[in-house]
Amino acid sequence: MNMLKVPLQIFRYKPGQAPRYDTFTVEIPAAAHVIDAIDAVWAIHDQSVAFRRGCHHSSCGSCAIRINGVEKLPCITRVADVWDGHDPLRVEPLRNFPIVSDLVVDVTGLFQRMSAADMSMICEAEAFLPFTVDTFAVADLDPKLVELPENFSRFSRFEKCIECGICVSACPTMAADEKFLGPAGLAAIHQARKKTDDPVRVEHLLGLANGEHGVWRCHSAFECTEACPQAVDPAGKIMALRRELIARRFTKMMGK
């Protein structure tokens, strides 16, 4: 088995202590992911290193960090793809969140913003299958047995959100305005808006989007969409909200 000796530079912070970087050298398989390197540091060198991990296949979002300054999921990022073979591979916590310890951040703000839209992160748009799917693909099933909701592709793209916080970390506006609803929060508002025609509900949601810390604070950098590991396209959702708000404004100006 081909092995790599990788110097891993980890951001360290404990409450009451000054932040610093510690570098550890770990030997890992050439096909290993960054989370495997962090695991090796914890197992071999220092069990005080704090980090989150879960599924190991990009479905839970808990491990999200910055790798060489770029927001990524270390569970699906191979070391060989991000390490130059010489300099230490740097791992740091996400930006725009309070740091709890080392690579662990407090993501409470992310969920608070998403809850502003009463957004339940449940994949309601998944295909309903009245039987257990084992080794065959959904695409191979009889279409008559698969019930897909209207506009399935649009809904499923948003509901692939794994609440990792990467979009919030990548967003330049979040660094300047801590009250900004953020890409995840505004994407949730957009999705909730698309699910309702109730006038009161629509006014509430668009009022949030049109507020001081809503869509107009976005700098249209599209960093959130670029960084999103699940192709949710939060920037596209923000632009869609802007278009609806502008259309409503023109409608009112025309007296309709």
What residue spans do the PLM features occupy?
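Eukaryote-biased recognition of intrinsically disordered, low-complexity regulatory segments
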Residues: 3-24
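Short, contiguous acidic and Ser/Thr-rich linear segments
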Residues: 21-33
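Ferredoxin-type iron-sulfur electron-transfer modules in oxidoreductases and energy-metabolism complexes
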Residues: 32-47, 92-256
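A short, aromatic/hydrophobic, helix- or strand-capping loop or linear motif
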Residues: 48-54
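Short, structured protein-protein interaction patches enriched in aromatics and acidic/basic residues
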Residues: 55-64
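Extracellular/mature segments of secreted proteins
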Residues: 63, 82-85, 226
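Glycine-rich phosphate/adenylate-binding loop and adjacent beta-alpha elements
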Residues: 70-91
